[in-house]
Amino acid sequence: MKNRIILLLLILAGAIATQAQRSQPLFPQTPGMVSFTYRNSFAKDVAATLDTLKALGITDMEFSNLFGSTAPAIRQMLDDRGMFCSSFGVSYADLTTKISEVGVNAKALGAQYVRVAYIPHEGPFTLDMAKKVVEEFNKAGKLLKEEFGITYCYHNHGYEFVPYGGGTLMDYLIEQTDPKYVSFEIDILWSFIHGQDPVKLIQRYPTRFKLLHLKDLRKGATLNTSGGTAVENDVALGTGQLDIPAILKEAKKAGIKHYYIEDESPAYARQVPQSMAYLRGL
């Protein structure tokens, strides 16, 4: 009898623990925001746009532009509103030719990361291009880390998923760059649209991804390898083709800390609140 009671108590405890796990939200934090989402608004008035974002509950920013202002001025605007810039996006040209200026601006913004989202190229991305990029990334990442204490991240844009060996040139970029100096930001839409599974990509390189762009692809939009798609194909999270919960579970397991909504659609002002409500409901 005593053993039966103990067994029942253990079963009950397990059921309670399982229910508690299920009731915990998958994404309890407020997501960050990529400034590119509100690029037209930022170009007109940085302070007013920050007010709009703060009213939505956004505090974590990834700036992709200084919008005619300066890094110290934007930092002050952020501080005044209880907001912060965790990542600073720059062009490949600036990374490779103005690295010290990039580091100074990133430091002034208070950013922990510097990010490049696109490698200029004509035609298909090639192994020779990838080899040059690896060299440049290692060089820039080393300087940013050693002189500024900042981590460099590369944001995939899809064209890197050209087949190479047993994988792709994205695998080559990840495997050939020095993990001490180069990390990555996974854009889940640009991974998915090129036939990749973001979950498997994170599983393959769980320690290399530090940042994540939250996006969804319109149902019916076709996959392609061009590195581009119509901006109207960006839709509110949870209404498109991507398995957002599965991606978030794997990203959390990998320890990714910063998640930024990026919505390139003209309907971003309507879709961003929808995306945030969706994340709260997970």
Regions found by a protein language model. Give the residues of each.
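Conserved beta-strand positions in the central sheet of alpha/beta enzyme cores
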Residues: E62, S87-G89, R115, C153, ...
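Acidic-and-aromatic substrate-binding clefts and catalytic sites of carbohydrate-active enzymes
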Residues: Y38-K44, D60-P72, V90-K98, H121-F125, ...
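Short acidic, glycine/proline-enriched helix-loop-strand junctions
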Residues: T70-F88, V133, F148-I150, R270-S275, ...
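Histidine-acidic metal/acid-base catalytic patches
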Residues: Q21-S35, F42-K54, G167-M170, I174-I186, ...
